[in-house]
A protein has these predicted regions:
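A binding-site-centric feature that preferentially detects glycan-recognition modules on secreted/surface proteins
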Residues: 1-111, 115-184
């Protein structure tokens, strides 16, 4: 799929999923990089709870923190205006980032997916395939932090998306991040 047709798909996705439209043409698209074929477009003003609710309307979801809008206190990228990131696009998070803590990623200046970006990617993937991402490994959304400093995590287990958390210094072979290419 070409980047142009993928952008058109995002336009339809936003219209059908959230009933909104905005000028996608003015969004800065990160420069293409080998291995990062998928684009995630984050619409302006979208909140974690709004995206989570759209997910929960389509497939089973559970979460540890009940008010994501309040409890997600920090994002590396904010959706005040629309923006785009590129991801590798696999069904599982990046194997080369296995067992790396959120702190290690930050020290190495690796941009990681935020919770909003992840939820949008999960929702878009589900609308395209009727399957959920991350059925074998836990994705660490290291571009975000809960207000208590913990890092949001996600896994799909038995057809249900589960949002939980890990410590910022936690290293575990089943815990992986998704690197993003951003140009904000």
């Amino acid at each position: 799929m070409s980047m142009r047709s993928d952008i058109g798909n995002w336009r339809r996705f936003y219209s059908e999923t959230f009933g909104v439209s905005f000028s996608i043409d003015k969004i800065k698209i990160p420069k293409a990089r080998p291995g990062f074929p998928r684009i995630i477009i984050v619409g302006p003003g979208l909140t974690p709870d709004r995206i989570y609710d759209a997910c929960a309307a389509r497939f089973p979801c559970v979460r540890h923190y009940m008010n994501l809008d309040r409890d997600v206190a920090q994002d590396e990228r904010e959706a005040q205006r629309a923006y785009a990131v590129l991801v590798r696009g696999g069904e599982e998070s990046d194997p080369e980032l296995a067992a790396m803590s959120a702190e290690s990623l930050r020290e190495r200046k690796i941009n990681a997916i935020t919770l909003c970006e992840y939820l949008l990617y999960q929702l878009k993937h589900f609308t395209e395939t009727r399957t959920l991402l991350d059925r074998k490994h836990v994705t660490m959304c290291a571009g975000s932090r809960y207000r208590d400093g913990r890092v949001p995590t996600a896994i799909s287990h038995r057809g249900e998306l589960k949002l939980h958390w890990c410590a910022p210094d936690e290293e575990n072979p089943r815990l992986r991040a998704r690197e993003v290419i951003a140009q904000i």
